[in-house]
Design a protein with these regions (language model features):
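Extracytoplasmic/secreted proteins and extracellular or luminal domains
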Residues: 25, 71, 98-99
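Core segments of cupin and vicinal oxygen chelate
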Residues: 2, 10-53, 59
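Short, P/G- and charge-enriched loop/turn segments at secondary-structure junctions
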Residues: 31, 64-67
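Absolute protein N-terminus
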Residues: 1-2, 130
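A short local loop/turn or secondary-structure capping micro-motif enriched for an aromatic residue
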Residues: 61-64, 98
Length: 130
């Protein structure tokens, strides 16, 4: 059986990124891994269904300057399913009220999804679906 084990995201601030996914999506943070020789730190965030995100920080990576949330080649977004339209609406409003950009929605898409798209603290697009 093939399954995606985890996705990894670069961040400028491990704690800020961790708090976003813990507070709004119920992730549980694992311990921090540190490799001082490479200027590298990382941490896994696990969700209730077993899905994981690895958040990583390094001193050797130059930030790419693009408009936050702008589309680009490569990973464009990842989706988190909440199970109901009401939960999508409620979380989207909570994120908006807490100052996180809502890029789209909540809305029903042409292919039947009910979703919104928000930006995490590093400008990654997070699609919130039913």
């Amino acid at each position: 059986m093939v399954r995606i084990e985890h996705i990894a995201l670069w961040t400028n601030d491990l704690d800020r990124c961790k708090q976003f996914y813990v507070r709004y999506f119920g992730a549980v943070a694992g311990g921090e891994y540190v490799n001082p020789a490479k200027g590298f730190k990382s941490m896994f965030l696990q969700f209730t269904d077993g899905a994981r995100i690895e958040i990583m920080k390094t001193t050797t990576l130059s930030p790419v300057v693009i408009e936050p949330g702008a589309q680009r080649m490569g990973l464009t977004h990842f989706a988190v399913s909440l199970g109901s339209e009401r939960l999508v609406d409620d979380l989207t409003l909570r994120l908006k009220n807490d100052g996180y950009p809502v890029v789209d929605g909540p809305r029903r898409t042409g292919d039947g999804y009910y979703e919104s798209v928000v930006l995490d603290p590093d400008g990654n697009r997070v699609e919130i679906t039913t």
